Amino acid sequence: MTNLSVNVNKIAWLRNARGESRPNLLELSELLIDAGIQGITVHPRPDLRHITPDDVYELSLLCIKKSVEFNIEGNPYSEPTKIYPGFISLIKDVEPDQCTLVPDSPDQLTSDHGWEIKVTEHNAIRDIVEDIQTAKTRVSFFVDPNLSQINSINEVGAERIELYTGPYASNPSPKVLSQYEKAYHHAKDIGLGVNAGHDLDLNNLELFLSKVPADEVSIGH
């Protein structure tokens, strides 16, 4: 069975835009959990445009209470600032079930590509993965359906990949879908779990899962 994790960033974004406490992030997240989802996903960015560190701690406690998975996305190179504790520090403090590493820049509106790990970067990235895993957190990498990059992710010690599904959502053709199907089977063959996310919704998810029965999909922004 494929687990469903809902990204609640935009609930926090709307709350912050209003400058008030509503919509209430915790209340709506609990409603989602009570409706049957298996996980909550957040992407706390250094500029705090939506999810804040306080949100991360509160959602972590909610997920523990409700026995659902908590997935934190972000760039491992995001350093501490006056308002942000740094991504790795936050992960090691919260110890989420899963950490999804995303290669985005601080001012990027949304994630729009997967990792391109060079051979010369393997040792440094492997150290990051091992550091996160000391928190008993599963490590996943956001990746395009690129077999060589999936191999690299396996070599640095991650447990899962998250297939970036933006291109599929824009063009759900058999040719595009076949690329994801090949990537899925390759990842499984070398022992990786497979998640998928980005612009997936009720209109395109059923077709995707018919060919790519991922361990987890995430929806929302």
Predicted regions and their residues:
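N-terminal small/glycine-rich loop or linker at the start of catalytic domains
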Residues: 1-17, 109-113, 125-134
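Conserved N-terminal beta1-alpha1 strand-loop-helix module at the mouth
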Residues: 1-70, 76-78, 92-94, 151-156, ...
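Active-site beta-loop-alpha junctions enriched in small/polar residues
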Residues: 7-13, 45-47, 73-79, 104-106, ...
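Glycine-rich tight-turn/loop motif centered on a GG-T
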Residues: 16-18, 109-123, 166-177
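Alpha-helix-loop-beta-strand connector modules within alpha/beta enzyme cores
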Residues: 34, 49-74, 118-140, 174-198, ...
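Glycine-rich phosphate-binding active-site loops on the catalytic face of alpha/beta enzymes
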Residues: 38, 43, 99-108, 160-171, ...
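Catalytic cores of alpha/beta
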Residues: 59, 79-93, 146-156, 196, ...
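Glycine/small-residue-rich loop that forms an oxyanion/phosphate-binding "nest" at active or ligand-binding sites
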Residues: 60-118
